[in-house]
Amino acid sequence: MRSSIHASRLRKMGQSIPASTGPMARSANRFLQNRAAIFGLVLLTPLLFAVLTYPLWLPYKPNDIDLMAMNSAPSWKHWFGTDGVGRDVFARTMEGGRISLLVAVSSVVLSTAIGFLIGAISALGGRWADAIAMRSVDLAMTLPPVIFLLVLASIIGSGIWSTVVVIALLSWPVLSRMIRARLLELREREFVMASRGMGAGLGHLLFRHGLPNSIDILVVYATLQVANAILLEAGLSFLGLGVPPPAASWGNMLNAARSTAVLEQFPWQWLFPGGALVLAVLAINFIGDGLRDAFDPRAELN
């Protein structure tokens, strides 16, 4: 009798205590409760779908020239109109999105890898490694960004992968400082000190302890940096130092439409690529802010 009463009490206690969830699950719940982040997803999802799948359902290619339809206004045939040589603006806007996102994502992957490695080596590699890494970060951060971009782009040259390298080399120092700050705290933990005592090498410390404990920083940085990279690519292409024509990118489409005649008489040639650029950057920033708030440790206290 007593055992049955005791068992029923245990069942009631188990029902009254909520099941604990891990930190990643709690972060995901906080992200899904962020209205701005969900709004960003709603904006970005159809844009990504259109950009990635447009060759399957659009009858026009981005570089198809139709001299009989030069500077045509938006219509059922050409949804976004045509440019000065009769190319479909919708097709070029979609292709420009593909190239701009390719440049942005590739540069973010490269800058994230560089930033993590330098920051982690600085924190876990010893005194000399820390001094050398931090002096390189200080040097990179003291260079004027615009001048550095222009000089580097003029040296490397224009092109998709040249633009990727230029943007990546400008973007990694901030991440290195964040990773270093996180791992300086981590290296004093008992499990890291135990690994050192057992003879673990730098590679083991970086990828067994450093990387898993830096995932939140890397995810938030990468998301927000994609938006910054899209803007940097657009700026370089607008100045003629990014993706070269006839390849389409949002930046060189705006560059091609910068004349007063086009701005005033054919506004669809800059309005649609400019609108897509703003929409993508806005949506990605909303998502990045939502991820930052979701991973914020202070949210655990609330």
Curated annotation (Swiss-Prot):
It is found in: Cell inner membrane. Residues 97-288 form the ABC transmembrane type-1 domain. One of its GO terms (cellular component) is plasma membrane. InterPro entries: BP-dependent_transpt_permease, MetI-like, MetI-like_sf, OppC_N. Keywords: Cell inner membrane, Cell membrane, Membrane, Peptide transport, Protein transport, Transmembrane, Transmembrane helix, Transport. CDD domains: TM_PBP2. The complex is composed of two ATP-binding proteins (BRA0404 and BRA0405), two transmembrane proteins (BRA0407 and BRA0408) and a solute-binding protein (BRA0409). Probably part of an ABC transporter complex that could be involved in peptide import. Probably responsible for the translocation of the substrate across the membrane. This is Putative peptide permease protein BRA0407/BS1330_II0404. It comes from Brucella suis biovar 1 (strain 1330).
